[in-house]
């Protein structure tokens, strides 16, 4: 018998199924916003039914989602809430636009309203964060702006009250409703993959760095976590394949549509897409062929005619198809445009055959605006018949094509062009009468101009078989070298040509290697920019972690306020004497140097924010690792990182320098402005708390007094929270210290719990001592005088 499934697992499965249904509805909304409104009018009954279901679902789930937001968020609950809000908002707007179109009949006005063309950009959200050190204003424009702000808020959680953080997170949530709640597909204007996320940083920390700094590696990083690439494969014959199985059509209509589709595809079928010779080169070859055809063995051979024949030999004998690089790297953007036109023509033909009208979709209604876009915008928008990978390959081929248009590379990559140019020069000289005479009985050319043209065209730049025979012929008998000054000059010229050819060949290889390396480096960015992107789980998970940390503070204060016994030292009489007594007794002692590493880790644990919780994982890492991720992800300056790392070691618990707070002014930031000074003051307060509790446990021998955070407790399956006894730092300036000295056996706060509120480290330690005194071996120390 199978084991029963737990209740949380069942709830999670139901939420996942619900999330899939809402995503499907959002996808339908996005399609109908861009579809011909006449088609949308035909779907009004189904659309209204879906809108009513979303209303009912939102009304039923909203109280539970709000309660969970105050308890413990999960990425699943965050995503579902965002989708529900977006589906409700945009579904109602689409219904209103369709009803307006039913009366007005204006297609352009419908798309202007549904696509928000007349409204300002919705992806600009101002965020205000109130901290103890002042107010911070930011603007969210990209998805990575949200992630960066959440990381910054996580780092500044020490100096941010829960109320201020909750208000700022609400503004972030409003931005995420339009950005993340709009379904799976990420709008291109929202994604900026050049900014690495926290997951990118963590991946680089566990991979080999090859001697490069983390900052340099991050600069070359293309983020694929906030948004993830989706492989899109387009079938060119999709319409032809699925049209025979379309429902709701008669056999006659289906047959007529198939016939029209086949006819349209046959009419729009283009060429083979292979490169063809230019008309100019073709005319030169025809002229040369005509001269050669008019000659026979009974006629005398002129030097020019012999040069033409030799050049035609090189043009005909060379295997150009296997050597040309242009075939592999030629631009194919025209072929993509032709494919788009073929797809559009086929779709329109089928629409006319089936419905008797051409549908006015968004891209057709605003076709003139789309046609006015430049090439970059058109590539980002994409097409219906070309996948992003096709566009990327076309762009890369265009890069090679542009690179190979330089004269040197063009002649090296396409040697036949040298022969074409030489042939054109010989024909021009023959036409001008420069080589019309000097009959020759079948020997090679002796005209210097024609010979040089032939050598440069066919041999000078590395044509097949060029150079070896001539060099042997120029050498004397027995290969003893040149015998005349003319032979020396000829050999020197041949050496120059050979060195030029070798240099050009090396230059070409280097140039193409550099271009290939550049293309490989930039291909990732091209793929991220042009491919279809879907939302990853980074943003919902980051938002949930940060929001849970601040919600835990408010929940902890609310739960402790309902304890059976609450002692509030913030306004109690006689607390000053307790403060003075405990302060004097602790300042007489020093922290054992052997304890400095452990209390340093305790300091890192309290300073670290709620986002990076590596110390709580199954394979836990020390607290300094989580703090390292926290400070590096916000770009903390090196001198501040050094100061933070040595904060505990600098004090060491010696003297009275570590006791920085005045009576009832612990975690007070009055008179301090600025994020960094306030953050440094918070570090001092936390150091004071750690050293004081360490000395307290050492002096009074009461065992280790636990310092805890309010977000250390996770809800149980019953929704209850367990807070073990200890001193809790709430990071709230009104009530920064809460001591739980007694609690129920299960660890939950209830009628048997005893809680102490305080704003002073030493007075709260004295209250803890009073409750521990009956259990101490010596009955405790005397109280204050």
From Swiss-Prot:
This is Tripartite terminase subunit 1. One of its GO terms (biological process) is viral DNA genome packaging. The keyword Zinc applies. One of its GO terms (cellular component) is host cell nucleus. Belongs to the herpesviridae TRM1 protein family. One of its GO terms (molecular function) is zinc ion binding. Associates with TRM2 and TRM3 to form the tripartite terminase complex. Interacts with portal protein. Residues 433-452, 457-489 are annotated as: Disordered. A zinc finger (C3H1-type) spans 197-225. Keywords: ATP-binding, Host nucleus, Late protein, Metal-binding, Nucleotide-binding, Viral genome packaging, Viral release from host cell, Zinc, Zinc-finger. ATP binds at residues 696-703. It is found in: Host nucleus. InterPro entries: UL28/UL56. Component of the molecular motor that translocates viral genomic DNA in empty capsid during DNA packaging. Forms a tripartite terminase complex together with TRM2 and TRM3 in the host cytoplasm. Once the complex reaches the host nucleus, it interacts with the capsid portal vertex. This portal forms a ring in which genomic DNA is translocated into the capsid. TRM1 carries an endonuclease activity that plays an important role for the cleavage of concatemeric viral DNA into unit length genomes. It comes from Human herpesvirus 1 (strain 17) (HHV-1).
